[in-house]
Amino acid sequence: MKIVLFGATGNLGNVILDEALNRGHQVTAVVRDPSKLATTHAGLTVVRGDVAQPSSYAGTLPGNDAAIASLNDHADPANVPRQATLLLETLSQAGVHRFAWVGGAGSLETAPGVRVIDDPGFPDAWKASAKAQIEALAVFRASKAPIDWTYISPAAEIAPGERKGSFRVGGEQLLVNAEGHSRISTADFAVGVLDRIEKGDAAKKRITLAY
């Protein structure tokens, strides 16, 4: 497949990039600063572009089969839902009709009507980013764009680790293991993202990945 990836220089985006290239996909990485992307590969094309400025990358989109966005803006989290809106519009205009968005875990439910972010112990430092991702999810759900989006929430804890290739796929509820922990490695999260892109089996849905 031909895939355009936004956010390839981020910690998680770079793992997703490696997974896509290792599967033999042709990847166009749209990054603000190409010098920050150390990956080199025959299947990789790097394009300088800013999600906030569609004209900087719109010309590279036609002909791609799918797109993946792994974005964050800790300096101004309010940019995140705006990025979702722009990408939905720009990708659909370019004829890219499959789109995976790396979301957050804060909107997952721990009980009916109770979200992860509603827990009194939810860290204050993460709240702005979590709220921004909740707003992004609302953008996707309200969108009328002709694009098969999938909003993919990680487990509550996601960190570098082993690529096991085995994990669970859920929906609106936070997935926890027998000990009550919600975890996944970045490597296995990337596996799940590429699985969804290849299969296209979660169109217009939010899903979550965890052990």
Enumerate the predicted regions with their spans.
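NAD(P)H-binding glycine-rich loop region in Rossmannoid oxidoreductase-like domains
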Residues: 4, 35-93, 201
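N-terminal Rossmann NAD(P)H-binding glycine-rich loop of SDR-like oxidoreductase domains
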Residues: 3-23
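Conserved beta-loop-beta element that borders a ligand/cofactor-binding pocket
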Residues: 138-159
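Core catalytic loop region at the nicotinamide-binding pocket of NAD(P)H-dependent oxidoreductases
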Residues: 199-211
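Substrate-positioning beta->alpha
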Residues: 132, 180-194, 205
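Conserved catalytic-site region of short-chain dehydrogenase/reductase
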Residues: 76, 106-111, 157-161
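Catalytic loop of short-chain dehydrogenase/reductase
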Residues: 101-133, 141, 152
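A conserved pocket-lining segment of Rossmann-fold NAD(P)-dependent short-chain dehydrogenase/reductase
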Residues: 168-184
